[in-house]
Amino acid sequence: GVWLAVLAFALLPVLGVGQYTIQWPGTWCFISTGPGGNGTNSRQNWGNVFFASDFAILGLSALVVTFACNLATIKALVSRCRAKATASQ
């Protein structure tokens, strides 16, 4: 399930939705966030915006899930420490 979704997202540029562009100094690439170069049509620009937006939403979602899991862990550890402290008294 998750692996198929990740594969589908990674293949979007191959299918023509969004694109990667080479970044300076030419040793790495990243998603294109703006209109392309010569002759880029509005469909390609829409694809770039869609892919960049999805990329950002997935990244922010991962950040929120990580933060929520960390908060749950902190809450569990604090309650466990408090329970041990009251049990030892």
Swiss-Prot record:
Stored Gene3D superfamilies: Rhodopsin 7-helix transmembrane proteins (1.20.1070.10)
Molecular functions per Gene Ontology: prostaglandin E receptor activity
Coiled coil: none
Annotated TM spans: 1-18, 49-74
InterPro entries from the UniProt entry: Prostanoid_rcpt (IPR008365)
Keywords: Cell membrane, G-protein coupled receptor, Glycoprotein, Membrane, Receptor, Transducer, Transmembrane, Transmembrane helix
Transmembrane helix is among the record's keywords: yes
Assembly with partners or alone: Interacts (via C-terminus) with MKLN1.
The protein's role, per its UniProt record: Receptor for prostaglandin E2 (PGE2). Required for normal development of fever in response to pyrinogens, including IL1B, prostaglandin E2 and bacterial lipopolysaccharide (LPS). Required for normal potentiation of platelet aggregation by prostaglandin E2, and thus plays a role in the regulation of blood coagulation. Required for increased HCO3(-) secretion in the duodenum in response to mucosal acidification, and thereby contributes to the protection of the mucosa against acid-induced ulceration. Not required for normal kidney function, normal urine volume and osmolality.
Protein name per Swiss-Prot or TrEMBL: Prostaglandin E2 receptor EP3 subtype
Species of the source: Ovis aries
Lineage of origin: Eukaryota, Metazoa, Chordata, Craniata, Vertebrata
Gene name of the encoded protein: PTGER3
